Amino acid sequence: MKSNSIITFVLLVCFSLTSVAQSTVDDPEIKKMLAEVKSENMEATVRKLVSFGTRHTLSDTKSNTRGIGAAQRWVKSEFDKYALASGGRLTSVIDYFTVKADGRRIATDSQLGNVMATLKGTDPTDDRVMVISGHLDSRASDVMDAKSDAPGANDDASGVACMMELARIMSQREFPFTLIFVAVVGEEQGLYGAKHLADKAKNEKWNLIAMFNNDMIGNSLSSGTMLRDNTRVRVFSEAIPFLETEAEAKVRKSINRDNDSPSRQLARYIKTVTNQYVDQLDIALVYRNDRFLRGGDHTPFSQNGFTAVRFCEMNENYDHQHQDVRKENNIQYGDLVEFMDFEYMKKVTLSNLASYSNLALSPKAPINVGIEVKDLTNFSTLVWTAPAGKPVYGYNILVRETSSQHWEKTIFVKGTKAEIPYSKDNFFFAVQAVDELGHSSLPVFPLPIR
């Protein structure tokens, strides 16, 4: 009887795999949103931000034509336009806060302000929150130079334009939980705007399930090596969580979970959704929190225990990054609009929109996800508890070999327990909840159950 049941289950698994492949269809509403992304809109946003001369965090706040203050007010005015089409659900604010002089990149006590739009969810019982950001500030060669031109077309008007395009499109629709779109400041001076928002989320106990940081997504040509790559974008994610208790570390080490942090699961999620919805763009999963010895606005969120990733172009051009605008030895330096690849930037924005909206429409993730370890067997039994809230149609069990970066197999099941013919010695697993339209939650890595 046991052998017959195993054979039957294997056949069911094979059938499930076939069924999933046949039934994976694009959500027409997400496809409609993607069709509304316009590279000319984002180019206009980038050019407008560049027109403010400099957006240095400590630059002029009074002028209406130059400096960070003018840029902040313009972004808010755009958010206010989007609000008109939102049925009153989108609201915007410049969230001012004070940063004390730090002896490094903040010379005197300064008032900074993140420009934030909040799209209120339609389900009052769903307390989830997501954040997407780009940083509004720019810099010249000298990080303390608040006077010289610092156009910041790519770093990071590109990320702000991406975020604003999502705000424009998504504010016309309804989503069950709250979505936040924010142009943070103080990035170049020490991630101050992101830290302020991350601390706010922690102190106010937000149920923040994901944070998308877009920083430099509009350049496709590297300096020096002269490599042009407009078909890949890097997504950075932390390996071992910044916040990890001694007990959690002990479990992680015992099951070799070093590459399965929640942030890394988000990165894989983005890759899966991008493969489904976006042509000619591959997500390059980079197994580090950020570039070598560098940081970004997702980092304060990770440090506060939130799931966060960074989108960044595949190859950076250091002639156009943190440079005074000048020409030397026939080389044009400076972060100018003329060096932008807006079609590449559009594809990265499509990836953001597909992933952000798919997750925004998803059911909550399964809870108490575990893998039974009471018996030695070449089968693996996973169990979990159904989440509260939005109805769940079923669950995806994700499977990959231990040496693989990305999930390789998807097994769809309807219950909350499944025995699958894959050894826990040779494979990693995760479970995600799925609704009837295929919107899936973030994957949850199982913990051992004895």
For each feature predicted by the language model, list its residue ranges:
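Metal-dependent peptidase/peptidase-like ectodomains
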Residues: 184-296
